[in-house]
Each structure stands twice: as structure tokens, then as C-alpha cells.
Amino acid sequence: MPYEFARYLKIRAAYGATWSPDGRRLAFLTDITGVPQAWEVPVGGGWPEQLTFHEERVSGVRYSPKGNKLVYSMDVGGNERSQLFLLGNGEERDLSRAPEAIHYFGGFAPDGESIAYTATRRNGTDFDVFVQDLSGEPEIVWKTTGYHTIADWAPDGSFLVVSRHYSNVNNDLYKLDLGSGETTLLTPHEGDARFLGARVTPDGTCVFLATDRDGDFVRLGRLDLSTLEIEHLTPDDWDVEEVELSENGRWLAVSRNVEGYSDFMLFGGRGRRAPGPAMPQGILGGFEFSPDSMRLAFTLTGPDRNPDVWIVDLPDGEPRRLTRSSTAGIPPSTFRGPKLVRYPTFDGREIPALFYEPDATYAPVVVNVHGGPESQSRPLFAPVTQYLLGRGYAVFAPNVRGSTGYGKAYTHLDDVELRMDSVKDLAHAVHWLRERGLESIAVMGGSYGGFMVLAALTEYPDLWTAGVDIVGIANLVTFLENTGNYRRALREPEYGSLERDREFLESISPIHKAEKIAAPLMVVHGKNDPRVPVTEAEQIVEKVRKNGGEVEYLLYEDEGHGLAKLKNRLDAYPKIATFLDEHLARAGG
């Protein structure tokens, strides 16, 4: 029998583990209370203990390498202005005390007495680098312009590795000497290149990282800090997605994204591949070595398993699930995985997609478009997808051109003036589905996926039965004008510049073609969204209503870019389901 939507939305997740200094406990995040909070569990197993008790989401937690204390991040109402808090020894204290600024935690000093982070404290726009003693005030150690994050703190405490981001697919790494304040560019390059997961070796002479500088895919590499040369350690065939180095330098844990699934690889500290544990199939992330470097904690999820924290003894132990996140009484055996398919598009390319099929032969279909656009639909656990499958829907998740996971060249196929080619890929997904007898088709997506929903409805109005736009972009010009200043700088290389490309951006924005929308539309947005301002939703709703179209609008006062709170998800998603049931069932007769 099908379960009500609320049951699926109450399926829990545990993720983001961090080891206590003695290696006996793991702190992690879980949404068991309805909003992600920090919890702790003994490594040997046992009942977990809640550590934070807030109404707002905790977005990250990290143990100090020394002493019984940790730092966690939290924002308010989805505004993404994360603040940093110290928790330990019965004390909970706001370290940042600057609610108007964004703070990105970068790590503890090796002695555990101070932290590093980047923040917009100075002017609200630029991410300066700060070091703060846990008992003192923040100190700017690098006054910057633009968007920066901290990749690693050298084991001897002498320098930081800082990432300067130019776009979602282009960044540089800098060495910041904490004694002199001198910065050194580590990754000179031309064009776009990513340098991810940087980890400094114990002797401070090299950095392990993942980069696509010298190829089409992101490969594992070792950067020599004296010569700046990079030795590549994996082939140029799939993206390396995770890199973590043990404290003693003995082990390097790596995973690659192979057709959306994670391929785990274990290396010795000198960069040579070693036999490793047999990991369960799924998507791995959040690698964290134990203080003694002999165990690895990680998060595992998959289409048929909700996220949980696992640990494994190295080099070849049996992975063990440490947390037991509830499936709300729904048997995991009812969860379905996708088929990996490819379909032809207008220029002869083959577009990869995940196709989730129910038992019904001629099911209504929801085409679910990922955001980004530099992102990828992967076979992770998605309660909404599983509900739709149980309800008799098929779900089709295409990775149209511009997606990551298939090489740098593929990611750039939708840049600026090529934007609408990705919308053509959506139209050809419908053609492929119709060839298989599937006629009643809705399109749904969030963030940039919401833009794709609106673009699909305006460019190809006859193909769609309904559309669901969640925190989506209706007008690329007003989006770039109103999003955060640092985000505008990151997004213009992808979408186009307001200064140079305004006319083109206006020509492809769905808001200027809203009269073409023929299918019923549902729009969902958070009032505090700092990425895609709520004015994007207001514009398209007003325009569709003015044109006499059918539109439902759900606005949540205490949310930002998406729905983080269970009470709001319990309100929104059943309404989305009712909307789809009504319009797709009507179309199917």
C-alpha cells in the first residue's frame, strides 16, 4: 500500500561526522528533530546524545583536535549568514558575534586553541581570512577582495591553504604564511580549472588535491610546494570528488564519481594505490580519519538507503553503519533505484539521465531538473522521488549539457550564449519519453532547476502537462542585480555579464515570455532567500496571473534557498503532490 507523503518527509538522515580527540566518539548532524542539529554517538555503538538544541539549522560541526570542545555553524531563517559557536565543557558561546556577516569555518589550528575562517565582516561583500583564538577576538590575516574559503591548515600551524574562487568551475589555491602574512599563488593556470580537496602532507612539502587543470576530468594530484609541479595519480576518465589525508600521512582516502556512483580508492601516503575496503554501492562523502589514522568515518547514501554515518578499519576492514536513521516505518525494500540511460538530443549528443520507473506501464512522468547548473543528478536518496514512485509516477532526472561529472568540456556546453541548448536537451527528453508511450509529463526543479522549469514552459509550451518551480530564477537580469554581490561575481562567468550581455540575458529570461506558459504552474519560495531573491517568484506569479494563466504560489516566511524546516516541507510537498495528481491525472484521462 502507498504511504502518505508525510511519512517519506519524516525519513531521517545523518551525515558530516567528526571525531573526538580521543577517538571514542563521533559528532554528526541529523534532522531527527525536524531541523539539522549536532549529535554525538560512541564509536563502539550506543544511544546518540543531542548536543545542540536550536530551532534553526546547524550546517556544520567540527571537533577540536585537543580538548572536549567543538565549533558549529548556524544561520537564521535560511539567510545563510552563518555564525560560529563554541560548544564544550558545559559552555556554549557565539564566537563570531556579527549576525550581518557570512562566516565559513576553515578549521582548527593543530594545537586546538584557535580557528581560521573566512567572513564578510569588513564590508559585507569580501571574504577576508581570519584567525581567532577561542578566548579572544578575530584577527584579519589576509584582507581580500572576492570569495575565499580555507582549504587546509598546515600540520605545523605555519600556513593556511586558501582557495580564491572566480566561478563555480574556476579557482586558485594560495599559501598564506601566518608569520609574515605573505601569500604565494600555488596554482597558476589559464582558462578555467578547479583545485579541490587540498590536504597538506605532515612534512609540509606537498599538497594532495584534485584538479582538472591539465585534462577534461578532475584527477587526484600531488602538488610540490617548492616547484609547484603537479603529479597526477588517477586517469583522466572520471572526476575525483573527495580527498582526505590521515593525520600521520599514512593513508589517503579518495572517491571518484563514476556515472553518479562513488568509486572508493585508498592510497598510501606517498601516492601509490593500495588495496582498500570493499565499500557498499552508493554515494560516499564526508571522509574523516580518526586521530590515530586507523579508521575512516564517512557518509553513505544511495537511491535505496537514506544517509547514515559509517566507519571502517583500514586498510581492509568491513564497513560498519554507526547511525541508524529512521525510514519512518517504510520498508527500505520498497525504495527503488534508477536505470542509467542516455537519450539523443538535437546535435547528436547522448544526454545521460537517471530513469526511475514504477510498476505501472504508462505512468505519468516528472522530469526533475537539478540546479547549479554546475551540478549533477546522482542516485542519492530522495524522499520526494520515492514518494512519487510509490504513487505510480516515473521520475526522469536528466544531466543536460552544463552538468558536472562528464568532463570540463561538457560542463561548458551551456555557457552564456549557449544557455538555451540545455533547454533543448529537456525537450528531447520529452521526445524520448513519448517514444516509450509516456505522454503525461511535468517538469520540476529547484534554484537553477527552477529557471529550467520556466524556460521549458515558455520555450516548449506544448510539451508539458504541468510545472513546479522551487526557488527558481524568472529573470536573469534581476537575479544578477539582486543576488549577493559575491554571488553575482561567481555567476556571471556562467550566465553572462550584466554589463556586456544584458540584452541577451533579457532575451532568454522566462519572465519576458510568460504569456506562452500554457501548463498549470506551482511556484515555491522562501522569503529570506539570499541566492535567488523572492522577487523572482513574485515576478513570474504576477505575470502568469496577469496573463490569465493558472498558478499556485507557496511562500514561506522563515525559509531561504529551499525548505530546511520539516514543518514547511510537510506543508509544501503534499500540496505539490496534490497539484501533480490533479493535473497529470486529468491529462491522462
Where are these regions (language model features)?
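A detector of repeated loop/turn-to-beta-strand junctions in beta-rich toroidal repeat architectures
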Residues: V35-Q37, R81-Q83, D126-D128, N170-D172, ...
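Blade-terminus and WD-like Trp-Asp/Gly-His loop motifs, strongest in beta-propeller folds
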Residues: A17-R25, V61-K69, G106-S114, A151-F159, ...
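Multi-bladed beta-propeller domains
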Residues: M1-A14, V41-S59, G77, L87-I102, ...
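Beta-strand-rich domains and repeat architectures in extracellular enzymes and scaffolds
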Residues: E4-W39, V61-R62
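Beta-strand C-termini and the immediately following turn/loop, strongest in propeller blades
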Residues: L26-T33, L51-T52, V71-G78, S96, ...
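Cap/lid segment of the alpha/beta-hydrolase catalytic domain
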Residues: R324-S440, G446-S447, A455, E459, ...
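Extracellular/periplasmic ectodomains of large secreted or surface enzymes and adhesion receptors
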Residues: M1, E244-G249, L266-G271, S290-M294, ...
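Active-site-proximal cap/loop segments of hydrolase catalytic domains
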Residues: V400-G589
